[in-house]
């Protein structure tokens, strides 16, 4: 048994898992895992929604509905971790992973096959700057 941390990689038979620690994005031991060859970010508690449906992907539901549910989820579970969220989004950008993400698979809710809208919303919701209404 080996503990992993940010920057560690694990080859699992021709596929590479890259690890990004994300403490206090809901839990102290939170971590993102990126499956490099497929472009899938397993985001733990980030980018989720509190919904449970038989269809798994964002494309099966209206974007407005999923973003409303994601905003409620963010408000209840992620808001206190907004400073860490901003750091993690910047880290994903700085190490070139953000543009490689083709899909986000959170622990809760639908899988984002089109991750751009939820990443944009998380950037907005996590911003410390006031927004005009």
Placement of each model-derived feature along the sequence:
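Generic preference for hydrophobic/aromatic residues in regular secondary structure cores
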Residues: 1-3, 32, 70, 133
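Short, surface-exposed, charge-dense and proline/glycine-enriched linear segments
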Residues: 12, 35-37, 132
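Terminal amphipathic helices with adjacent charged low-complexity linkers/tails
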Residues: 108-131
